[in-house]
Design a protein with these regions (language model features):
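Conserved beta-strand in the GNAT
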Residues: 51, 57-65, 72-77
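A contiguous, mid-protein "functional segment" used to position or interact
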Residues: 129-161
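Active-site rim helix/loop that mediates acceptor-substrate recognition in acyltransferases
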Residues: 26-49, 53
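Conserved active-site alpha-helix within GNAT-family acetyltransferase domains
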Residues: 110-131
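Conserved acetyl-CoA-binding loop-helix of GNAT-fold acetyltransferases
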Residues: 78, 84-97
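Conserved small/polar residues in nucleotide/adenosyl-binding loops
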Residues: 176-182
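Conserved GNAT acetyl-CoA-binding A-motif
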Residues: 99-111
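Short amphipathic alpha-helix that is part of the acyltransferase structural core
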Residues: 1-35, 148, 161-175
Length: 187
């Protein structure tokens, strides 16, 4: 049985698994620094950093933000030794039921086989690809933004809400200059 469990730094074993998987699955420019990630995990009320367990065994991680009008999946990864085993599909089906609201996530532009496959994976799970220009802001001062695309699931009209969603992500989640993660009203 798969379980998605919020994890904080005090849970050293599970948090260490999540942190190592994030560092393996995402290059530095696609994730915040370790200190800030830990701070958000422990203190930001809108940020949920989760370990994915199957029968008590660690198999992956997923982090998302509660944004009011939608949820934003920031990072999702299955242990590399377990990929292509159907876990990703099962976890996203669970998340879609648990979150009970529109979901937004970022994907790399389809410039290679892996990014194309990832987009098709999300499409099979009923996510819609939006081709409007979108730049993921840098996680660190001095880094460059990354060209990405947004995908959505659920009742969200990106024709009219794209700019609002983008501004919310920029303001509340992604900028290294964002306010202190301790203040859920401004973080």
């Amino acid at each position: 049985m798969i379980e998605i469990k919020q994890v904080k730094t005090q849970d050293e074993v599970n948090y260490t698994f999540v942190e190592k998987l994030m560092h393996t699955a995402f290059p530095q420019e696609e994730r915040r620094d370790t200190v800030q990630q830990r701070e958000y995990s422990d203190n930001n009320l809108r940020f949920c950093n989760n370990i994915i367990l199957e029968n008590g065994n660690s198999i992956g991680m997923i982090s998302y933000w509660t944004m009011g009008d939608f949820y934003y999946i920031e990072h999702f990864a299955i242990d590399p030794s377990l990929r292509n085993g159907g876990y990703g599909k099962r976890v996203l089906e669970m998340i879609k039921k648990q979150l009970k609201g529109p979901i937004v996530l970022e994907v790399e532009e389809p410039n290679d086989e892996m990014s194309t496959r990832r987009i098709h994976f999300y499409k099979r799970l009923e996510f819609t690809l939006h081709k409007k220009p979108y730049m993921q802001p840098p996680y660190r001062k001095g880094d460059n933004g990354l060209p990405m695309l947004l995908m959505t699931y659920g009742d969200i009209d990106m024709e009219s809400d794209f700019e609002k969603v983008k501004k919310t992500l920029y303001k509340d989640c992604l900028l290294y200059t964002s306010p202190s993660p301790r203040d859920p009203k401004t973080s």
